[in-house]
């Protein structure tokens, strides 16, 4: 992808019309690629513009449309509650990684879907942070409070600051907001709670993640 961008940006007339680059999450983590783009084009925006769970709300089946148009259900052993939790963890992991490598904006493909995971232009159904019931009311999936927490820590105009994490179970991203407050997001990937010591400006904060 970087090679394609480089080729496009080599055209001066085309490059002057580019404000930034959009990217998705579907083929795995590409955090290093974001950092390379940030280094190459520091004046351009990096915006995550599409991601969503690949199953209907409250359903542990992944939905996919085959080439012949027949809908396939790919069953798994996860319960809806388990897969909702894994969705939320995937969102947090992706956002933390993107923030740490130069992302400046994040957009979900489906902020709201109906109970069938639609409407969609192709077969199947997708999940979302919010689901609209038949009477028009909204209910939150587990993804929503994760997004709330991250958006509350990284407010518009925030500047990412350096951090270091000891160990592999806890992911972190930190920033300074325009009002001078420090925002910190921690994601515990372990199966159990862990104690976290946060050192900042010579002070120590003990928390549980």
Label for each model-derived stretch:
Residues 33-36, 61, 121, 162, ...:
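Composition- and surface-driven signal marking solvent-exposed, interaction-prone regions
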Residues 152, 162-203, 207:
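Carbohydrate-binding surface patches
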Residues 33-37, 93-97, 170-174, 185:
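Generic recognition of flexible, low-complexity loop/linker segments
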Residues 25, 48-51, 107-111, 186-188, ...:
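Active-site proximal loops enriched in glycine and acidic residues that flank catalytic Cys/His/Asp
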Residues 1-59:
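Active-site neighborhood of glycoside hydrolase catalytic domains
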Residues 16-19, 41-46, 101-106, 156, ...:
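Loop/turn elements at helix/coil->beta-strand transitions in domains of secreted/extracellular proteins
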Residues 10, 100, 149-152:
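Sec-exported extracytoplasmic/periplasmic mature domains
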Residues 48-146, 161-166:
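Aromatic/acidic polysaccharide-binding cleft in carbohydrate-active enzymes
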């Amino acid at each position: 992808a970087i090679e394609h961008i480089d080729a496009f940006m080599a055209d001066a007339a085309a490059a002057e019309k580019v404000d930034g680059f959009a990217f998705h999450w579907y083929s795995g983590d590409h955090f290093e690629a974001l950092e390379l783009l940030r280094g190459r084009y520091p004046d351009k925006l990096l915006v995550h513009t599409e991601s969503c769970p690949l199953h209907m709300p409250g359903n542990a089946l992944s939905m996919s449309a085959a080439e012949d148009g027949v809908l396939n259900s790919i069953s798994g052993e996860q319960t809806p509650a388990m897969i909702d939790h894994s969705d939320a963890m995937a969102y947090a992991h992706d956002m933390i990684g993107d923030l740490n490598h130069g992302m400046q904006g994040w957009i979900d493909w489906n902020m709201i879907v109906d109970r069938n995971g639609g409407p969609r232009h192709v077969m199947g159904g997708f999940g979302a942070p919010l689901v609209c019931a038949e009477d028009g009311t909204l209910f939150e999936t587990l993804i929503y409070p994760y997004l709330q927490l991250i958006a509350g820590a990284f407010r518009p105009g925030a500047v990412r600051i350096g951090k270091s994490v000891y160990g592999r179970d806890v992911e972190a991203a930190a920033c300074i907001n325009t009002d001078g407050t420090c925002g910190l997001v921690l994601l515990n990937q372990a199966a159990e709670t862990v104690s976290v010591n946060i050192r900042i400006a010579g002070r120590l904060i003990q928390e549980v993640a």
